[in-house]
Amino acid sequence: FDNAATDYFAVENSIFENSASANWFDPDDGHYDFNPQFADTTYVLSEYSRAIGRGGSSIEDADENDLLAPGVDLLGNPRPNPAESSPDLGAYEHVRSEYRRAVYYVDDANGDDEAPGLTIATAVKSIANAFIISSNRDTIELAAGTYSGADNRNLNMGGLTRIIRTSSGPASTIIDCENQGPAFVFDTDEPDSVHISGLTIINGSSENGGAISIDGADPVFENMIFRDNNSDGNGGAVYASDSYSSFTNCVFVDNHADQGGAFYLSGGDVSLNHCTLLDNTADDDSGIKNASGDLAVMNSIYWGNDEISGDV
């Protein structure tokens, strides 16, 4: 666009390719720069398109008049559809009120970060790239393998709800942080609908939470193994501050920290259910450190660790 300074240029609830760096680009005003994912050459949206339900009912023109969205699309179908939902972007209205949540596949051995990731055959290579192309409430499924390197650690959930899983199990699906950071960071109020399951995390290292660092978020972990992670500060495997997270069917083994060899809690309400904690050590002699908050340990085995410090 080449508008003079006096021209009126209003953009709301629209996709503009390569516009994210423009001085007018503002996601809070409905400015988007993502692939609309057309179903075919007719430019109808696919059911996975994030353009579904992203429209608005009106826009204000230069004279502060409301311009109303049309009641039908190019084919004469009612807009929005269904009624009382938000309209879609573009010329065609989809039958869905919101886009179908997608599954993105990751394969460290055979994946390609230029691939779309929506099938096993078109899997991406890194978890970081799966984060980039996926959206809120999508699922990321990891193939068996060992995931290492900068694109497979320090993964910040960014406030989005995601399910991260594998069908192969933790014995064969491993994130190796190579002592260069934690695997996952939660610091943007992620809810308890964030689920991570079926992975082993090894060689994580950070000041707070060698493998997992949680601050004010409530993720859920199931069927996980945390092994050989360390922290110079708190929580060799997991650091949780003001968190209502839960851990079920998890193993913590050979993790080390200054405080809380396996786990450090500071505020919140965290549960460990059907977990096994073995040979976790800390410089202050606590395998689990509860500095404050409520920690519930149920149906679990705590063996060969330094003693628990704080209330449980």
PLM features: residue spans?
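N-terminal extracellular ligand-recognition/capping segment immediately after the signal peptide
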Residues: 136-162, 169, 173, 306
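Extracellular "leader-to-stem" segments immediately downstream of a signal peptide or signal-anchor
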Residues: 50-58, 89-110, 128, 132-139
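Right-handed parallel beta-helix/beta-spiral solenoid domain characteristic of secreted/periplasmic
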Residues: 33-37, 160-206
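Predominantly extracellular beta-rich ligand-binding scaffolds that present long acidic/polar faces
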Residues: 1-48, 60-63, 75, 83, ...
